[in-house]
Amino acid sequence: MREKIKLESSAGTGHFYTTTKNKRTTPEKIEITKFDPVARKHVKYKETKLK
């Protein structure tokens, strides 16, 4: 079953993306480079819990 997760910016701007992932096939935490519109550059986004 796919679970909702939050990808939070490592730039400290407070910006985040929400997405889903299959916990059975990818049990480890996701770390992706995406665009941060607040910082106006590409930064790493780390998976956190969606509250």
Swiss-Prot record:
Keyword ATP-binding on entry: no
GO terms, biological process: translation
Repeat keyword on record: no
InterPro entries in alphabetical order: Ribosomal_bL33, Ribosomal_bL33_CS, Ribosomal_bL33_sf, Ribosomal_zn-bd
Keyword annotations: Ribonucleoprotein, Ribosomal protein
Domain of life: Bacteria
GO molecular function, one term: structural constituent of ribosome
GO cellular component entries: cytosolic large ribosomal subunit
A matching Pfam family: Ribosomal_L33
Family: Belongs to the bacterial ribosomal protein bL33 family.
Protein name: Large ribosomal subunit protein bL33
Organism per entry: Nitrosospira multiformis (strain ATCC 25196 / NCIMB 11849 / C 71)
